[in-house]
Amino acid sequence: MGRIIGIDLGTTNSVVATVGAGGCKIIQNKEAEQMTRSVVGAYKNDFLIGTPALNRWPLAPRDTVISIKRLMGRSASDPEIESVKKSHLYEITEPSDGSREAICVKMAGEEYTPVEISAMILKKLKTDAEFALGDPVTHAVITVPAYFSEKQIDATREAGIKAGLTVMKIIDEPTAAAVAYGIDSREQEAKTILVYDLGGGTFDISVLMMSAGAYAILDREGDMWLGGDNFDQIIADYVIDCVKSEFGVDPAENHRFMATLRMETKKAKEALSSAPMATILIPGLLRDEDNDILDVDLDITRDYFVEKSRPLVAKTVALSKKALKNAHLTMEDIDYVLMAGRR
Protein backbone atom coordinates (compact mmCIF):
# COMPACT_ATOMS: atom_id res chain seq x y z
CA MET A 1 0.00 0.00 0.00
CA GLY A 2 1.30 3.44 -0.97
CA ARG A 3 0.97 6.74 0.84
CA ILE A 4 -2.37 8.13 2.02
CA ILE A 5 -3.34 11.75 1.41
CA GLY A 6 -6.20 13.96 2.48
CA ILE A 7 -7.83 16.06 -0.24
CA ASP A 8 -10.01 19.13 0.09
CA LEU A 9 -11.57 19.16 -3.38
CA GLY A 10 -12.85 22.72 -3.49
CA THR A 11 -14.94 24.74 -5.91
CA THR A 12 -12.23 27.35 -6.39
CA ASN A 13 -9.11 25.78 -4.88
CA SER A 14 -8.05 22.29 -3.81
CA VAL A 15 -5.54 21.32 -1.13
CA VAL A 16 -3.63 18.13 -0.35
CA ALA A 17 -2.19 17.17 3.04
CA THR A 18 -0.57 14.18 4.67
CA VAL A 19 -0.10 13.14 8.28
CA GLY A 20 3.27 12.04 9.62
CA ALA A 21 5.27 12.05 12.81
CA GLY A 22 5.26 15.84 12.81
CA GLY A 23 1.51 16.09 12.40
CA CYS A 24 -0.54 17.30 9.44
CA LYS A 25 1.39 18.94 6.60
CA ILE A 26 0.09 20.61 3.45
CA ILE A 27 1.82 19.35 0.30
CA GLN A 28 2.85 21.92 -2.29
CA ASN A 29 2.07 21.28 -5.94
CA LYS A 30 4.63 21.39 -8.76
CA GLU A 31 4.03 25.14 -9.08
CA ALA A 32 5.23 25.51 -5.44
CA GLU A 33 1.71 26.50 -4.33
CA GLN A 34 -0.12 25.23 -1.27
CA MET A 35 -3.42 25.48 -3.13
CA THR A 36 -4.17 24.14 -6.59
CA ARG A 37 -6.72 26.10 -8.57
CA SER A 38 -9.71 23.90 -9.43
CA VAL A 39 -9.49 24.87 -13.09
CA VAL A 40 -9.09 22.70 -16.21
CA GLY A 41 -8.35 24.02 -19.69
CA ALA A 42 -7.97 22.38 -23.09
CA TYR A 43 -4.69 23.23 -24.80
CA LYS A 44 -3.00 21.69 -27.86
CA ASN A 45 -4.77 18.31 -27.65
CA ASP A 46 -3.98 18.11 -23.94
CA PHE A 47 -5.14 19.67 -20.68
CA LEU A 48 -3.77 22.32 -18.37
CA ILE A 49 -4.79 22.07 -14.73
CA GLY A 50 -4.49 24.59 -11.91
CA THR A 51 -2.64 27.89 -12.30
CA PRO A 52 -1.44 27.15 -15.87
CA ALA A 53 -5.09 26.74 -16.93
CA LEU A 54 -6.14 29.85 -15.01
CA ASN A 55 -3.41 31.94 -16.64
CA ARG A 56 -4.68 30.96 -20.11
CA TRP A 57 -8.33 31.52 -19.21
CA PRO A 58 -8.59 34.94 -20.91
CA LEU A 59 -7.10 33.46 -24.09
CA ALA A 60 -9.45 30.47 -24.16
CA PRO A 61 -12.52 31.34 -22.07
CA ARG A 62 -14.78 28.81 -23.83
CA ASP A 63 -12.28 26.00 -23.30
CA THR A 64 -11.56 26.61 -19.62
CA VAL A 65 -13.74 24.99 -16.95
CA ILE A 66 -14.07 26.49 -13.48
CA SER A 67 -16.28 25.70 -10.45
CA ILE A 68 -17.02 22.17 -11.67
CA LYS A 69 -17.87 21.11 -8.11
CA ARG A 70 -21.20 22.90 -8.46
CA LEU A 71 -22.16 20.46 -11.22
CA MET A 72 -21.15 17.23 -9.47
CA GLY A 73 -24.06 14.82 -9.23
CA ARG A 74 -26.39 17.24 -10.99
CA SER A 75 -28.51 16.78 -14.10
CA ALA A 76 -29.44 19.04 -16.99
CA SER A 77 -33.03 19.08 -15.71
CA ASP A 78 -32.10 20.71 -12.38
CA PRO A 79 -33.70 24.19 -12.26
CA GLU A 80 -30.55 25.83 -10.84
CA ILE A 81 -28.50 24.86 -13.88
CA GLU A 82 -29.94 27.66 -16.03
CA SER A 83 -28.50 30.32 -13.71
CA VAL A 84 -25.15 28.52 -13.68
CA LYS A 85 -25.05 28.57 -17.48
CA LYS A 86 -25.41 32.35 -17.44
CA SER A 87 -22.54 32.85 -15.00
CA HIS A 88 -19.97 30.66 -16.80
CA LEU A 89 -18.28 31.19 -20.15
CA TYR A 90 -17.89 27.53 -21.08
CA GLU A 91 -20.81 25.51 -22.45
CA ILE A 92 -22.92 23.48 -20.04
CA THR A 93 -25.36 21.13 -21.72
CA GLU A 94 -27.10 17.78 -21.58
CA PRO A 95 -25.13 14.91 -23.13
CA SER A 96 -25.43 14.39 -26.87
CA ASP A 97 -27.46 11.23 -26.21
CA GLY A 98 -30.22 13.55 -24.99
CA SER A 99 -30.30 12.39 -21.38
CA ARG A 100 -31.74 15.05 -19.07
CA GLU A 101 -30.63 13.03 -16.04
CA ALA A 102 -26.98 13.85 -16.67
CA ILE A 103 -24.92 16.90 -17.54
CA CYS A 104 -21.70 17.66 -19.36
CA VAL A 105 -19.43 20.56 -20.25
CA LYS A 106 -17.65 21.21 -23.52
CA MET A 107 -13.98 21.95 -24.12
CA ALA A 108 -12.43 22.10 -27.58
CA GLY A 109 -15.65 20.68 -29.02
CA GLU A 110 -15.61 17.56 -26.85
CA GLU A 111 -18.01 16.58 -24.06
CA TYR A 112 -16.78 15.88 -20.53
CA THR A 113 -18.76 14.98 -17.44
CA PRO A 114 -18.18 16.77 -14.12
CA VAL A 115 -16.75 13.49 -12.81
CA GLU A 116 -14.17 13.45 -15.61
CA ILE A 117 -13.16 17.08 -14.99
CA SER A 118 -12.90 16.49 -11.24
CA ALA A 119 -10.84 13.36 -11.91
CA MET A 120 -8.35 15.47 -13.88
CA ILE A 121 -7.94 17.78 -10.89
CA LEU A 122 -7.59 14.85 -8.50
CA LYS A 123 -5.05 13.21 -10.81
CA LYS A 124 -2.89 16.33 -10.69
CA LEU A 125 -3.17 16.46 -6.90
CA LYS A 126 -2.12 12.81 -6.72
CA THR A 127 0.78 13.21 -9.16
CA ASP A 128 2.06 16.38 -7.48
CA ALA A 129 1.86 14.71 -4.06
CA GLU A 130 3.90 11.77 -5.36
CA PHE A 131 6.49 14.20 -6.71
CA ALA A 132 6.72 16.01 -3.36
CA LEU A 133 6.73 12.89 -1.18
CA GLY A 134 8.92 10.75 -3.39
CA ASP A 135 6.56 7.80 -2.91
CA PRO A 136 3.53 6.39 -4.73
CA VAL A 137 0.18 7.73 -3.52
CA THR A 138 -2.57 5.13 -3.69
CA HIS A 139 -5.20 6.06 -1.11
CA ALA A 140 -7.10 9.21 -0.19
CA VAL A 141 -9.68 10.71 2.13
CA ILE A 142 -11.73 13.35 0.29
CA THR A 143 -13.92 16.06 1.80
CA VAL A 144 -17.38 17.09 0.57
CA PRO A 145 -19.92 19.65 1.82
CA ALA A 146 -22.04 18.39 4.71
CA TYR A 147 -25.26 18.71 2.69
CA PHE A 148 -24.01 16.83 -0.40
CA SER A 149 -26.56 14.28 -1.59
CA GLU A 150 -25.67 10.62 -1.99
CA LYS A 151 -25.56 11.18 -5.74
CA GLN A 152 -23.01 13.97 -5.30
CA ILE A 153 -20.96 11.91 -2.85
CA ASP A 154 -20.96 8.97 -5.27
CA ALA A 155 -19.82 11.29 -8.08
CA THR A 156 -16.92 12.49 -5.92
CA ARG A 157 -15.93 8.92 -5.09
CA GLU A 158 -16.09 7.98 -8.78
CA ALA A 159 -13.83 10.91 -9.66
CA GLY A 160 -11.30 9.71 -7.11
CA ILE A 161 -11.33 6.21 -8.58
CA LYS A 162 -10.90 7.60 -12.11
CA ALA A 163 -7.87 9.51 -10.83
CA GLY A 164 -6.28 6.24 -9.72
CA LEU A 165 -7.03 6.57 -6.03
CA THR A 166 -8.56 4.15 -3.57
CA VAL A 167 -11.04 6.40 -1.78
CA MET A 168 -10.85 5.25 1.82
CA LYS A 169 -13.47 7.64 3.10
CA ILE A 170 -15.59 10.63 2.13
CA ILE A 171 -15.69 13.01 5.09
CA ASP A 172 -17.88 16.08 5.52
CA GLU A 173 -16.02 19.39 5.40
CA PRO A 174 -17.15 20.76 8.80
CA THR A 175 -15.80 17.73 10.67
CA ALA A 176 -12.61 17.89 8.62
CA ALA A 177 -12.25 21.58 9.46
CA ALA A 178 -12.71 20.94 13.18
CA VAL A 179 -10.02 18.26 13.10
CA ALA A 180 -7.66 20.32 10.92
CA TYR A 181 -7.90 23.40 13.09
CA GLY A 182 -6.91 21.42 16.15
CA ILE A 183 -10.09 21.52 18.20
CA ASP A 184 -9.37 18.84 20.77
CA SER A 185 -11.96 16.10 20.44
CA ARG A 186 -10.25 14.07 23.18
CA GLU A 187 -11.85 16.10 25.93
CA GLN A 188 -14.23 13.96 27.94
CA GLU A 189 -16.62 16.84 28.55
CA ALA A 190 -18.95 17.37 25.60
CA LYS A 191 -18.34 20.56 23.61
CA THR A 192 -20.38 22.15 20.84
CA ILE A 193 -18.85 23.71 17.73
CA LEU A 194 -20.41 25.97 15.13
CA VAL A 195 -18.57 25.64 11.81
CA TYR A 196 -19.21 28.54 9.41
CA ASP A 197 -17.66 27.53 6.09
CA LEU A 198 -17.95 30.04 3.25
CA GLY A 199 -16.05 28.59 0.30
CA GLY A 200 -15.54 29.67 -3.27
CA GLY A 201 -18.82 28.26 -4.51
CA THR A 202 -20.71 26.85 -1.54
CA PHE A 203 -21.75 27.76 1.99
CA ASP A 204 -21.90 25.26 4.84
CA ILE A 205 -23.06 25.81 8.42
CA SER A 206 -22.85 22.88 10.82
CA VAL A 207 -23.36 22.36 14.53
CA LEU A 208 -21.10 19.63 15.90
CA MET A 209 -20.92 17.91 19.26
CA MET A 210 -17.53 16.53 20.26
CA SER A 211 -16.78 14.22 23.14
CA ALA A 212 -14.13 11.60 23.93
CA GLY A 213 -12.57 11.56 20.49
CA ALA A 214 -15.80 11.49 18.49
CA TYR A 215 -17.74 14.08 16.50
CA ALA A 216 -21.48 14.08 15.89
CA ILE A 217 -23.37 16.45 13.57
CA LEU A 218 -26.36 17.93 15.39
CA ASP A 219 -27.57 19.87 12.37
CA ARG A 220 -26.33 21.12 9.04
CA GLU A 221 -27.55 23.71 6.59
CA GLY A 222 -26.06 25.06 3.42
CA ASP A 223 -26.48 26.74 0.08
CA MET A 224 -24.90 25.05 -2.94
CA TRP A 225 -25.12 28.30 -4.89
CA LEU A 226 -23.66 30.75 -2.36
CA GLY A 227 -19.94 31.36 -2.07
CA GLY A 228 -17.06 33.62 -2.99
CA ASP A 229 -18.11 33.51 -6.64
CA ASN A 230 -21.29 35.39 -5.72
CA PHE A 231 -19.31 38.13 -3.98
CA ASP A 232 -17.08 38.37 -7.06
CA GLN A 233 -20.20 38.81 -9.17
CA ILE A 234 -21.08 42.00 -7.25
CA ILE A 235 -17.87 43.60 -8.48
CA ALA A 236 -18.29 42.17 -11.97
CA ASP A 237 -21.82 43.58 -12.22
CA TYR A 238 -20.53 46.98 -11.07
CA VAL A 239 -17.89 47.01 -13.81
CA ILE A 240 -20.35 45.85 -16.48
CA ASP A 241 -22.85 48.56 -15.51
CA CYS A 242 -20.12 51.22 -15.56
CA VAL A 243 -18.89 50.11 -18.99
CA LYS A 244 -22.42 50.20 -20.38
CA SER A 245 -23.03 53.64 -18.89
CA GLU A 246 -19.70 55.23 -19.83
CA PHE A 247 -19.03 53.66 -23.23
CA GLY A 248 -22.43 52.41 -24.38
CA VAL A 249 -20.95 48.94 -24.83
CA ASP A 250 -22.22 45.65 -23.40
CA PRO A 251 -19.10 43.57 -22.63
CA ALA A 252 -21.01 40.38 -21.79
CA GLU A 253 -20.49 38.86 -25.26
CA ASN A 254 -16.74 39.50 -25.20
CA HIS A 255 -15.62 36.27 -23.57
CA ARG A 256 -11.98 37.28 -23.32
CA PHE A 257 -12.93 40.46 -21.48
CA MET A 258 -15.31 38.59 -19.18
CA ALA A 259 -12.67 36.00 -18.26
CA THR A 260 -10.18 38.76 -17.49
CA LEU A 261 -12.84 40.56 -15.49
CA ARG A 262 -13.48 37.46 -13.37
CA MET A 263 -9.78 37.30 -12.51
CA GLU A 264 -9.65 41.02 -11.70
CA THR A 265 -12.74 40.87 -9.49
CA LYS A 266 -11.05 38.33 -7.22
CA LYS A 267 -8.04 40.61 -6.87
CA ALA A 268 -10.27 43.58 -6.11
CA LYS A 269 -12.28 41.63 -3.53
CA GLU A 270 -9.11 40.58 -1.72
CA ALA A 271 -7.75 44.15 -1.85
CA LEU A 272 -10.95 45.51 -0.29
CA SER A 273 -10.41 43.34 2.78
CA SER A 274 -7.60 45.69 3.83
CA ALA A 275 -8.05 48.84 1.73
CA PRO A 276 -10.91 51.35 1.41
CA MET A 277 -10.74 51.23 -2.39
CA ALA A 278 -9.63 48.90 -5.18
CA THR A 279 -8.92 49.51 -8.87
CA ILE A 280 -10.04 47.32 -11.76
CA LEU A 281 -7.81 47.89 -14.79
CA ILE A 282 -8.49 46.03 -18.06
CA PRO A 283 -6.84 47.74 -21.02
CA GLY A 284 -7.48 47.16 -24.69
CA LEU A 285 -9.98 44.30 -24.72
CA LEU A 286 -13.09 46.27 -25.68
CA ARG A 287 -13.95 48.44 -28.66
CA ASP A 288 -16.67 51.05 -29.05
CA GLU A 289 -19.10 51.37 -31.98
CA ASP A 290 -16.41 53.24 -33.96
CA ASN A 291 -14.01 50.32 -33.38
CA ASP A 292 -11.80 52.44 -31.13
CA ILE A 293 -9.98 50.58 -28.36
CA LEU A 294 -11.39 51.09 -24.87
CA ASP A 295 -9.46 50.91 -21.61
CA VAL A 296 -11.43 50.03 -18.48
CA ASP A 297 -10.03 51.81 -15.41
CA LEU A 298 -12.49 51.86 -12.51
CA ASP A 299 -12.38 52.26 -8.75
CA ILE A 300 -14.72 50.47 -6.36
CA THR A 301 -15.01 51.35 -2.67
CA ARG A 302 -15.21 49.00 0.25
CA ASP A 303 -18.36 50.79 1.44
CA TYR A 304 -20.11 49.99 -1.86
CA PHE A 305 -18.97 46.38 -1.77
CA VAL A 306 -20.03 45.89 1.85
CA GLU A 307 -23.46 47.38 1.20
CA LYS A 308 -24.07 45.20 -1.87
CA SER A 309 -22.82 42.14 0.02
CA ARG A 310 -25.32 42.49 2.86
CA PRO A 311 -28.03 40.28 1.28
CA LEU A 312 -25.50 37.47 0.79
CA VAL A 313 -24.22 37.77 4.34
CA ALA A 314 -27.81 37.86 5.60
CA LYS A 315 -28.45 34.49 3.91
CA THR A 316 -25.54 32.93 5.81
CA VAL A 317 -26.79 34.39 9.09
CA ALA A 318 -30.31 33.08 8.47
CA LEU A 319 -28.98 29.59 7.75
CA SER A 320 -26.82 29.76 10.88
CA LYS A 321 -29.84 30.63 13.02
CA LYS A 322 -31.82 27.83 11.39
CA ALA A 323 -29.10 25.29 12.19
CA LEU A 324 -28.98 26.40 15.82
CA LYS A 325 -32.76 26.25 16.10
CA ASN A 326 -32.89 22.76 14.61
CA ALA A 327 -30.21 21.65 17.06
CA HIS A 328 -32.25 23.17 19.93
CA LEU A 329 -29.35 25.45 20.85
CA THR A 330 -28.60 29.16 21.16
CA MET A 331 -25.29 30.95 20.62
CA GLU A 332 -24.75 30.83 24.39
CA ASP A 333 -24.56 27.03 24.10
CA ILE A 334 -21.70 27.14 21.57
CA ASP A 335 -18.20 26.51 22.95
CA TYR A 336 -16.26 27.13 19.74
CA VAL A 337 -16.97 29.03 16.53
CA LEU A 338 -14.82 27.98 13.59
CA MET A 339 -14.83 30.15 10.47
CA ALA A 340 -13.43 28.35 7.43
CA GLY A 341 -13.23 28.89 3.70
CA ARG A 342 -11.17 30.99 1.37
CA ARG A 343 -11.78 33.34 -1.58
Please place each PLM-identified region on the residue numbering.
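Oxyanion-binding/catalytic loops of NTP- or PPi-dependent enzymes
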Residues: 1-86, 91-99, 106-120, 127-343
